[in-house]
Amino acid sequence: MKNKSACFFVLSLFVCSMFTSCNKESTTECQTIDFSTLFDGQPEKIPLKEWAKSIHFVQLETNDSILIGNIRATILHKDKILVHHNNLSLFDLSGKFICNIGSKGGGPTEYSGINNAWTDDEGIHIFDIANKIKTYNWNGKWIKTEPIPESNIKEVFPLASGNNIKAGYIQNITGNEPHKIYLFKDSTILAKIPYGKSFQKGEMTMVFYNECYPFHANGRTFFKEMFNDTIFSIDNQYQPVPRWYI
């Protein structure tokens, strides 16, 4: 339990420090965030109310039509909560169930499975495990299907700049993948971000889902890889810029 408390403390401090730095400074110079001194003492409990402006507990409605399994992610979009579990389910801020988003299946308006999802004013976008992006409206109905430019892409996220430009992340499972991120619009590739090094594949391979964590702040796009100590931003030329060393 102490280890879990310490990890939560470090994660919380990192997130708050990162956003404070991002909000207060416009410099593009890479900064170092040093957590090493935090491990010298004992973990300390910090009330959530000291970190948040307000706290709300939302109990999600469940019934015969909606049974929540293992929750992989939640997305807050204006006055709605999107829950990614076995499916995608939409709730209002009180936890009342609104609808399911699409349905699983092999039909043209269905999805085979969900790699990840994101939202905008147009609706809910699902990166299907069948290597297509399915878009649904806020009533859960299918709108369109888009291709992706590279079949090895495992995660897709939109850029903060908008204009329907997306980034597709490729895990370096083989050890010799040439590029980690493809920047694309529709099926047209705009730029590629290369891997910095290769490695010899071992006898056993372990694959992690969501190996790349993207986020937006102040109109910019950032990403952090699981096995990389640097947080990068993506500039206007679609190139990675080191922003923080951890």
Regions found by a protein language model. Give the residues of each.
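Loop-centered beta-sheet repeat module
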Residues: F184-P242
